[in-house]
């Protein structure tokens, strides 16, 4: 089992632009057959700090997710509005 914690840092002036893209990314990812969990949270103290908590059966499933049409279209659009680079933490179940 693979758990992913991914953080995005969006410039505050671009939140209205990226929020619909995040909503679409979450909706379509949750429909992927190998997606176990895919949740997006917003930091209460920093509305530009988004945290994905994902669960996949294995690395191959995550790799397949990263090749989907919605991921390859939406993530570069979102990344254009980053205040700083994303952080991704991959963890195996203990």
Where are these regions (language model features)?
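Short amphipathic alpha-helical segments
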Residues: 14-36, 70-74
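Short, well-ordered beta-strand segments in beta-rich or mixed alpha/beta enzyme
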Residues: 2-8, 39-66
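Structural detector for hydrophobic anchor residues on beta-strands
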Residues: 4-6, 33, 84
């Amino acid at each position: 089992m693979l758990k992913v914690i991914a953080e995005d840092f969006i410039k505050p002036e671009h939140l209205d632009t990226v929020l619909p893209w995040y909503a679409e990314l979450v909706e379509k990812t949750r429909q992927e057959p190998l997606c176990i969990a895919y949740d997006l949270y917003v930091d209460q103290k920093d509305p530009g700090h988004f945290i994905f908590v994902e669960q996949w059966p294995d690395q191959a499933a995550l790799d397949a997710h990263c090749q989907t049409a919605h991921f390859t279209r939406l993530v570069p659009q979102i990344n254009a509005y980053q205040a700083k680079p994303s952080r991704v933490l991959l963890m195996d179940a203990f």
